[in-house]
Amino acid sequence: MSRGLLNKAYEPHEAEEKWYQYWMDHDYFHAQDASEKTQFSIVIPPPNVTGMLHMGHALNNALQDIMIRFKRMQGYNALWMPGTDHAGIATQNVVEQELAKEGLTRHDLGREKFIERVWQWKENYGGVIINQLKRLGCSCDWSRERFTMDEGLSRAVREVFVRLYHDGLIYQGDYIVNWCPRCHTAISDLEVEYKEEPGFLWNIRYPFVDGSGDIIVATTRPETMLGDTAVAVNPNDPRYIDKVGKEVILPIVNKRIPIIADDYVTMDFGSGAVKITPASDPNDFAIAGRHHLEIIKIMDGSAVINENGGIYQGQDRYICRKNIVKDLEKQGYLISTEPYTHNIGQCYRCKTDVEPAVSKQWFIKIQPLAKAANAAVVKGKTRIVPTMWEATYFEWMSNIRDWCISRQIWWGHRIPVWTCENCSQVIVSSTDPDHCTGCQGSSLRQEEDVLDTWFSSALWPFSTLGWPDQTEALKTFYPTSLLVTGFDILFFWVARMMMMGIYVMKDVPFRDVFLHALVRDEQGDKMSKSKGNIIDPLKMIDQYGADAFRFTLAAFTAQGRDVRMSEERIEGYKYFVNKIWNATKFSVMNLEDYPETDQVGIRKDEESLPDRWIKVRLNKTVHEVISGLDEYRFNDACGSLYQFIWHEFCDWYLELIKPVLYSRDHPARRQAAQHTLLEVLKTSLKLLHPFMPFLTEEIWQKIVPDGTSIMVSPFPAADARFEDPDTEKQMELIMDIITRIRNIRGEINLAPSKKLKVLVSAPNKALAAILDEGRDYIVNLANLEEITIGVNLEEPKGSAVGVVGSVRVYVFMEGLIDIASEKARLEKEMNKIAKDLSIVSKKLANRDFMARAAEAIIKKEEDKYKDLRDKHVVLEAAMKKLEQTVKS
């Protein structure tokens, strides 16, 4: 058979570049807008245009590519929609940093010129992550690549905003929002990360105006007292019932503020009395609304004290805090200071402490949208996998707050709202108006703010398919089939896509949502530059190849568990790649004389037991891989493939058929083995292709030289004809006997080259006959000089015994080893291990060590203990075997 020879070793970089270009040239990634095939579609979670490929991207996109290649091979009209996100604040920050190197700010350029500069930056650097995804092997339909600031997507954004506004779901109002003093913009609740930090609780005396004493107020933020407008107590607190309605003097500021009663106040926090600062706390803001309190802003957009701060004007908030505490102490208002640990909200982009601030913002009235999105999951229209995330989704949707969608930056979708400067008429339009609809004047001023980046991302499943136009792509691929994303953006993105998809399209945006976990280091720690534990995906691809890297990511993706990654694990699967390559080389060499067409008539009676067995095992593997992928159990699918290819195909089947392949005595039997070998190899490659696309294409083109790509060949399907439990049991028994003989050889330290004499005793004739069929396999793979198989045979003297179910295996020991010297060797080794075990167990029993040592060190010692204990068990078994031999 004229099949191409394989190189000595697999060269991943050469193969990756060659085959990716080949797939692109043949348009294999393209999906048809109109097709008779069933559609399967995925929209990519668009990476930031500023982004570089990190481990989270690598995992997310490897899983998507596995699914899209799998479904494409199953015959679906499979679309993987690619694109990037404009990433408002992140991108603006990057470009502002570039300007700073030139000694410029965005204000020096002005809005229009600055936006031009961002577009220029996007054109120069925005495609980096796309090229990196291609290196990973991602088979997106690149002809459809979208960007969230594309003209078409911008049109969709405006259209949805206008619809929401006219439906009464968008409003503008003064509200307390999370303000980032570094990014100079409001951010949503979801964009705030909370970090537990040590701080202080200051107890401050507020004297009554009438001189009748004072009330003690506890606060973690004394600088905000500059904006206090009341002191609040619980209406049911007996300590303060007669104090409600009185006035106190606000220290430092020296103005009168009232004592009010509100149910929000908890009686057991501090003294039970709290200061109310409406402009600096969302709860205080709500209380101020109920009690009609004045709202006094004390900070500017950079968290610097403004003109309302009196002598503290111009001070940073934390410097102001120190100065106010000093002044309170000096003036006799500070009663005490206590250590206090509390959660500090930080901007998830720049890690600056967020400042609650009152400002005029645009909001979406979210409850009506959330209700429909919640119901869709309850009714099963969208399935969340793993299901454990459903409870989190429901809880969040039930307690959702209105979404602040305006951002005080320049890069992004500018809010499509105009105000007439003549008559103050507000115009909300999906197109730029040229005149006022009220007074017909032409002097219009557009809203300065842009929309939250997540607003455009929420429209991604339908805007990328051409909406608001009713395109063929939209009709074919919406709702999409699957969304693969990290659980950390379930609320940022998934929930919002659900709400917008149902609102705009009247249907869910996807049928399934698979939420994968985070990629952590081997110890389970988050990867970070400061810890020095970051793994660079591109370096891993350079060093080990994309196939080994992809397979590692999938193999460690177990539902509900973080992906623990290390370079050693990736290297381990590089060995798997090498194993497949070497097995293929062996196969190709032994298929050289196989007929050009493999459609030869193979008689069933010429098929050997290993031929029948490997087909049964392959059929089970097909079922397990399909089941694993259909249920997003990527680790199970990988585990089945690894077990079958490495252990069953390479370690067993190839070894079992070598005598048949090397011999010319039985041509029909040899051809049957060749036929099975080729079919199993081809099917295995197809199963493996979604995980290892480059390796499988390289091999496929050598063994199936008809010019077709493996990526468009049919995916295997399980076949009931190959379900044969009897064959499986028979082969497993023979394999277990071979393994037991090998173990005995190892236990008594016999060289693999030393031929053995073995007696195998079965409990009945039927089982003896089955074993007799496997006689040659046992002789060859256990390296036997002689084997006797019978029923209820007597145990020979001087033999080592092994038990396999109801079968006894006796290995003759006479003349093979010096029992005395072997016993001495074992005793010496066991004593050494016992000594090491004692040292490690004492260390693990030491409370000081367990309390002070790092988790990784403790784990290392525990692993060492287990390894030593396992070795001791093996040596004990070998010693018993020797003693058994002496007795018999």
Predicted feature locations:
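Feature 926 captures the class I aminoacyl-tRNA synthetase adenylation module centered on the KMSKS loop
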Residues: 203, 395, 399-455, 459, ...
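Catalytic alpha/beta core of large soluble enzyme barrels
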Residues: 222-302, 329, 370, 798
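Residue patterns forming the tRNA-binding/recognition surfaces of aminoacyl-tRNA synthetases
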Residues: 4, 9, 18, 22-26, ...
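Short, solvent-exposed turn/loop segments enriched in Gly/Ser/Thr/Pro and often Arg
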Residues: 35-37, 45-46, 79-92, 145-153, ...
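N-terminal catalytic cores of NTP/NDP-binding nucleotidyl/phosphoryl-transfer enzymes
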Residues: 34-95, 148, 157, 218-220, ...
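Non-catalytic terminal extensions that flank enzyme cores
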Residues: 1-55, 78, 335, 348, ...
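Alpha-helical support elements that line or immediately flank enzyme active sites
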Residues: 57-59, 282-287, 496-504, 641
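Secondary-structure transition/capping motifs at alpha-helix termini
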Residues: 69-77, 98-111, 131, 135-140, ...
